[in-house]
Amino acid sequence: DVNSLDPDFGLPFSDRFALAFDFDLEDNMFFGVEYNKDSVDRAFAYIDPNLEGNVAGTLPDGRTYYSNSEGDLHTTFTDLGQTTSWSYKFTKSWFDNKLKLYLAYSDTEAEDVFAAGSSTQGSNYGKYATCNNQFYPNLCTKPSLWGASERYVGTLDYTADIFGADNPTRFYLYWLRESGRPFSFT
């Protein structure tokens, strides 16, 4: 197995922008909105030079699959991939902050070429689903593995003085709902 590196390869980086507005409302209420944008300038991409010409067939979803490779990988880079997200949060408290409610929603659109969640070329290339172009990775992106497109969060927090004011007791409820499935098949 040979792992080669593009001679022009550099460390991955991206441009990021964030803008947030927070509003203190009346009656112990708070509202916030945030926008985040992340654009890839350089990210990992992998090419398996031994797959060229070794097309074995087509998968039911239209992607090409290849016969076994020799295990040689060439690491290069891509400028494709981006993340855009909006998030909203609301808090309200009652009874001198003894009862608190927190609600939040986020909407994220994230695309990347390779997930790059491992420490070696082979596992980054072989573990994660990729675009359907192993020879020209700069031509395609796919939904990212790392971001849930929608997320809802809620908490309810109550502080009681069951054992006196010096030893407060907290009751805490937490709720989370994310889009997607806990497992996927690729």
Language-model regions: role of each:
Residues 33-37, 103-107, 158, 171-177:
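Transmembrane beta-barrel strands of outer-membrane/channel proteins
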Residues 28, 94-98, 161-168:
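Short loop/turn motifs that connect adjacent beta-strands in outer-membrane beta-barrel proteins
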Residues 4-7, 71-77, 85, 137-143:
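Extracellular loop and loop/strand-boundary signature of outer-membrane beta-barrel proteins
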Residues 1-74:
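Solvent-exposed loop/turn elements at secondary-structure boundaries
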Residues 5, 15-19, 82-88, 150-156:
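Hydrophobic, lipid-facing positions within transmembrane beta-strands of outer-membrane proteins
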Residues 44-50, 113-120, 184-186:
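Outer-membrane beta-barrel translocator domains and adjoining extracellular loop/strand segments
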Residues 23, 92-94, 158-160:
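Residue-level signature of outer-membrane beta-barrel architecture
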Residues 153, 157-186:
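Conserved small-residue
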